[in-house]
């Protein structure tokens, strides 16, 4: 039985005589201190010093005082908090206790008076009704006192008599080790509701959501985050307590790193304001146009920096606990309670996305460390290519050998191409004697599999005149990729074969949605929405994970990492997706074109994780299916608090421990009625369906659901399955027919698909728009960075391919900027946090920076050619302002690299490509976006090539591919080089006094050239040759600009020229 004390915030349990009793207090005399080794000693009154009144742990007074002042303030043995003894100095926690005046006398036992004192103590706790009625006890339930009394022995055996052999007839109260309890926490979170732990285990699952929400919230706040073991109920009770702990935690960056960083940011903001004030109030009269252009550019750069900087104010890391996830949902010997997950793989063109790459991704999914009956892999072939279909059939056969090999030897990664290409000691930690033999055999099997795939690829190079035919002689339905029916093929799963060990494999399903002329297909977003519907009809996983065809599972536990957040009752109900960072293979050593995007993934997204969560980056993301359906999140009052800067400066609105967390059952009803963001709630639909009393009302409800989700009763029924799985009323024989129906080209007509549900249409970068809509409804997202990267993919290392990729991203941002979903004006009545909105605004306006950036990069050349400058002669004070500005810029960069652990080279590559992309791809995106939105001139979607290098490592890096994107940066390079030559020539002709002003102009020009240096190397290529067409066009433009500027120099007065000409004559 458990009893409690409200005033002392602790519980005790009585032992019976079968337990090992604690030592009588009289035996403590002569004990050795268990910390320092000295004698325990006596008090001032000559009695044995007892540090802990609960267990009598031997501790001398010096160690006792040290532990209370500088230590944990708890007994090392029983973890009970030390009480203050008379004469001991007070510590902070003593202020909350009752005054202690006679602690020593209360336990002042000596050899001569034990008999006089112990009977009195025993009488106080005897089982007589007189004493029981006078001893009220308060229990704690959710932080509220509940009065109670110690029951009589015949009712509940409150006290177990343990007779001291030296004191016959006297009952001694034996206490368990005591833990200090937080009165605001539920007792269930400590595992101390019932002595019978077996009963608690049975009732645990019914109470887990309620308790975990309360407990995890306190855990993240650092209140009660450490849970001590009971030490008496055995390993089973400890296992139950461990299973109830949060499955993840927030790891804040050290304040020693963040505080200087924030101080420098504030100082930089102040210095920037002073600098801009100086620049705007000190024009250059003889170069007014150049000065005005430079000031406008600098003001925009300052605004752009603010948009980028503020969301990085409060970065965080996260840590997951896979062992707790297993204890809670996936115990050995019991059916797994992990949620079902549907994995989406999207591909379009097998010529640019090689089937072998897609096959490796699929194999890594099928071999993932997750219950096979909980995983389904859907491959979307939006190009309806028979090559993809046949390659997937070969992949399904090979997986029957590959999957058991991976699981038997627990290898990583589980994509065979990348596993066998690892240059590591593959025998490390592999103790099975059969491993080497089986690995060699598996490698031979994989080489044969590659040969079969390559034969299919070679065969697909020449398309037959009559189109492709299948093995049974029938025509391939997808011969016309723009006009074909929907196709679904289940390769593995319940209807497929078993692996070589006789075990079931995850489902593998091929899907190609229907396409017909006259229907808008919305590219990748439309294909993903088709996968949402077909997966809901066939498997209906509670969570969805999407990856590109070239992003394989590098960590077989990636899904479990995501489930640590998604299945956590405290945050899972309000988490729309878990985003993993993108990591890449096959990038050159120096990452010439910043393909790794390290600054974005390791700095920007960690900053957003401390606000409302990272943006969705298009791949490597695990979604909550309910969030994609447009439903409302389950929010608490904490989620509606001010933005993080206000919270950091002025504190939270919470008021200590007395704050009450809203009840879990009430959270689902939290909605904003005045929001212009469509918000749906599961309970609303339940009421719609169950609350009607007549068939007419039910018909109206059905029409509303069809208007939202489309005319598929099976799919609509699946949307109500919040935990996944198919409804019990579903007829398996009709599922494939219904699946074909939901991927038909006209299914989305007059529904909310692409508007409020699923992937959102309206931009080629559908990922940004989809994540923004979820955040606007109040959902949060999580950034998960496991120690072993979850996914790895390929990136375009060729300059032209890289620029085309950046062009597509920038074009999508411009489309969102000019749409109704623009974060500048959309969803202000929703639940999007201020700093999150600023981050989204920065995500869509960054291409506009290309215009001032282009102008700013041309300024050094014009200054050198015309012998003018954008800054007037400056005083010492102005010089100090400039030096402080540059110092603050570099100081903030260095401190940012320090807390993020990003390498300096990665940061510099990012800065260089910001200029390269800004003066090329971003500039083109602005004009293409304007033409597309206002003139209706659409641009073709270009799939980035994922083909691997066949001519050697990084051969693709040196291949030149012509694109008009190369012209603007090349022109900037040539103009600045011409300007440098002109400036030096002028200084040589003008004498020594002209070299001083020249230095500032040369530094300005070299700053531009240094940022464009990787671009210059890309132009030269392996043979150090630049294509003639690029040289001709760039030289022509540079010459035109230079001659035109010299001919109509606006900074030299016409009268001056005329006068000089006259005098020369």
From Swiss-Prot:
Signal sequence, start to end: none
Binding-site residues, Mn(2+): 524, 548
Residues that hold UDP-alpha-D-glucose according to the record: 346, 352-353, 382, 523
Gene Ontology biological process terms from the UniProt entry: cell wall organization; cellulose biosynthetic process; plant-type primary cell wall biogenesis
Positions glycosylated per UniProt: 940
Gene that produces this protein: CESA10
Sequence intervals crossing the membrane: 258-278, 287-307, 851-871, 877-897, 913-933, 964-984, 996-1016, 1026-1046
Function as written in the Swiss-Prot or TrEMBL entry: Probable catalytic subunit of cellulose synthase terminal complexes ('rosettes'), required for beta-1,4-glucan microfibril crystallization, a major mechanism of the cell wall formation.
Localization, UniProt: Cell membrane
Topology within the bilayer: Multi-pass membrane protein
Family matches, as PROSITE patterns: ZF_RING_2
Protein name in UniProt: Probable cellulose synthase A catalytic subunit 10 [UDP-forming]
Ranges facing Extracellular side: 279-286, 872-876, 934-963, 1017-1025
Pathway entry: Glycan metabolism; plant cellulose biosynthesis
Active site (record annotation): 382, 767
Any coiled-coil regions, as ranges: 436-463
């Amino acid at each position: 039985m458990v009893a409690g004390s409200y005033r002392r915030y602790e519980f005790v349990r009585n032992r019976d005589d079968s337990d090992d009793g604690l030592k009588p207090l009289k035996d403590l005399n002569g004990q050795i201190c268990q910390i320092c080794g000295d004698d325990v000693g006596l008090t001032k009154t000559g009695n044995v010093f007892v540090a802990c009144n609960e267990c009598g742990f031997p501790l001398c007074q010096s160690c006792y005082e040290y532990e209370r002042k500088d230590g944990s303030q708890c007994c090392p043995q029983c973890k009970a908090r030390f009480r203050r003894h008379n004469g001991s100095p007070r510590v902070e926690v003593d202020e909350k206790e009752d005054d202690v005046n006679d602690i020593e006398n209360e336990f002042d036992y000596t050899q001569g008076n034990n008999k006089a004192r112990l009977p009195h103590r025993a009488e106080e706790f005897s089982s007589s009704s007189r004493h029981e009625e006078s001893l009220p006890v308060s229990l704690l339930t959710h932080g509220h006192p509940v009065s109670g009394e110690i029951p009589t022995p015949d009712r509940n055996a409150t006290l177990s008599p343990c007779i001291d052999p030296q004191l016959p007839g006297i009952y001694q109260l034996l206490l368990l080790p005591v833990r200090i309890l937080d009165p605001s926490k539920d007792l269930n979170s400590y595992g101390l509701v019932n002595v019978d732990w077996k009963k608690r285990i049975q009732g645990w699952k019914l109470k887990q959501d309620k308790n975990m929400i309360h407990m995890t919230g306190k855990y993240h706040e650092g209140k009660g985050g450490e849970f001590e073991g009971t030490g008496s109920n055995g390993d089973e009770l400890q296992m139950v307590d461990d299973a109830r702990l949060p499955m993840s935690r927030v790891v804040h960056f050290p304040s020693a790193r963040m505080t200087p960083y924030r101080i420098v940011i504030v100082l930089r903001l102040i210095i920037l304001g002073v600098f801009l004030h100086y620049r705007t109030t000190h024009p250059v009269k003889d170069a007014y146009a150049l000065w005005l252009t430079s000031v406008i550019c600098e003001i925009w750069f300052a605004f752009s920096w603010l948009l980028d900087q503020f969301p990085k104010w409060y970065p965080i890391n996260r840590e997951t606990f896979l062992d707790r996830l297993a204890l809670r949902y996936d115990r050995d010997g019991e059916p797994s309670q992990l949620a079902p997950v549907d994995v989406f793989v999207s591909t379009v063109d097998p010529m640019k996305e090689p089937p072998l790459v897609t096959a490796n991704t699929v194999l890594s999914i099928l071999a993932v460390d997750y219950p096979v009956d909980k995983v389904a892999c859907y491959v979307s072939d939006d190009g309806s290519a028979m090559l993809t279909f046949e390659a997937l059939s070969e992949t399904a056969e090979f997986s029957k050998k590959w999957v058991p090999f991976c699981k038997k030897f627990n290898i990583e990664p589980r994509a065979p191409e990348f596993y066998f290409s690892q240059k590591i000691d593959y025998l490390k930690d592999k103790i099975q004697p059969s491993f080497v033999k089986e690995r060699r055999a598996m490698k031979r099997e994989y080489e044969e599999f590659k040969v079969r795939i390559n034969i299919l690829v070679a065969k697909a190079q020449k398309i037959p005149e009559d189109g492709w035919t299948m093995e049974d002689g029938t025509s391939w339905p997808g011969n016309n990729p723009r006009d074909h029916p929907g196709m679904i093929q289940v390769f593995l799963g319940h209807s497929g074969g078993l692996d070589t060990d006789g075990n079931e494999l995850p489902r593998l399903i091929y899907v190609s949605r229907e396409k017909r002329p006259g229907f808008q297909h919305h590219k990748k977003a439309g294909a993903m929405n088709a996968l949402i519907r077909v997966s809901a009809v066939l498997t209906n996983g509670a969570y969805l994970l999407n990856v590109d065809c070239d992003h394989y599972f590098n960590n077989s536990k990636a899904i479990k990492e995501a489930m640590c957040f998604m299945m956590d009752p405290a945050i899972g109900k309000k988490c729309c997706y878990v985003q993993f960072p993108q990591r890449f293979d096959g990038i050159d050593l120096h990452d010439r074109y910043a393909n790794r995007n390290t600054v974005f993934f390791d700095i920007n997204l960690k900053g957003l994780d401390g606000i409302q969560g990272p943006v969705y980056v298009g791949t490597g993301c695990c979604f909550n299916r309910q969030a994609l359906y447009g439903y409302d999140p389950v929010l608490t009052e904490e989620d509606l608090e001010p933005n993080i800067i206000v919270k950091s400066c002025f504190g939270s609105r919470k008021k200590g421990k007395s704050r009450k967390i809203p009840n879990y059952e009430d959270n689902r009803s939290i909605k904003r009625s005045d929001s212009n963001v469509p918000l749906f709630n599961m309970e609303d639909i339940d009421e719609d369906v169950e609350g009607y009393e007549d068939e007419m009302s039910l018909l109206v409800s059905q029409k509303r659901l069809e208007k939202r989700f489309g005319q598929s009763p099976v799919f609509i029924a699946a949307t109500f399955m919040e935990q996944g799985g198919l409804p019990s009323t579903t007829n398996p024989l009709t599922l494939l027919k219904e699946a074909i129906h939901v991927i038909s080209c006209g299914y989305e007509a007059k529904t909310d698909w692409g508007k409020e549900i699923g992937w959102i249409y309206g931009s080629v970068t559908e990922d940004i728009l989809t994540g923004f809509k979820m955040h606007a409804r109040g959902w949060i997202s999580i950034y998960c960075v496991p120690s072993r990267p979850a996914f790895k993919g390929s990136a375009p290392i060729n300059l032209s391919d890289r620029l085309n990729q950046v062009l597509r991203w920038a074009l999508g941002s411009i489309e969102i900027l000019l749409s109704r979903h623009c974060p500048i004006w959309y969803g202000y009545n929703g639940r999007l946090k201020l700093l999150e909105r600023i981050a989204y605004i920065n995500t869509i306006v960054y291409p506009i920076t290309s215009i001032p950036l282009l102008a700013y990069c041309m300024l050094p050349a014009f200054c050198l050619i015309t012998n003018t400058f954008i800054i007037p002669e400056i005083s010492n004070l102005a010089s100090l302002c400039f030096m402080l500005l540059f110092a603050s810029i570099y100081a903030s960069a260095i401190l940012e690299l320090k807390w993020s652990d990003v390498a300096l080279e990665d940061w510099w590559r990012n800065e260089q490509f910001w200029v390269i992309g800004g003066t090329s791809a971003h500039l083109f995106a602005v004009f293409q976006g304007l033409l597309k939105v206002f003139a209706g001139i659409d641009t073709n979607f270009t799939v980035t090539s994922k083909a691997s290098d066949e001519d050697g490592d990084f051969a693709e890096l040196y291949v030149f591919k012509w694109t008009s994107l190369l012209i603007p940066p090349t022109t900037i390079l040539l103009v600045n080089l011409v300007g440098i030559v002109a400036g030096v020539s002028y200084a040589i002709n003008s004498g020594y006094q002209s070299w001083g002003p020249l230095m500032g102009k040369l530094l300005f020009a070299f700053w531009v050239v240094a940022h464009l240096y990787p671009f210059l190397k890309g132009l030269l290529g392996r043979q150090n040759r630049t294509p003639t067409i690029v040289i001709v066009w760039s030289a022509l433009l540079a010459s035109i600009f230079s001659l035109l500027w010299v001919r109509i120099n606006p900074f030299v007065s016409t009268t001056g020229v005329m006068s000089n000409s006259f005098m020369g004559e």
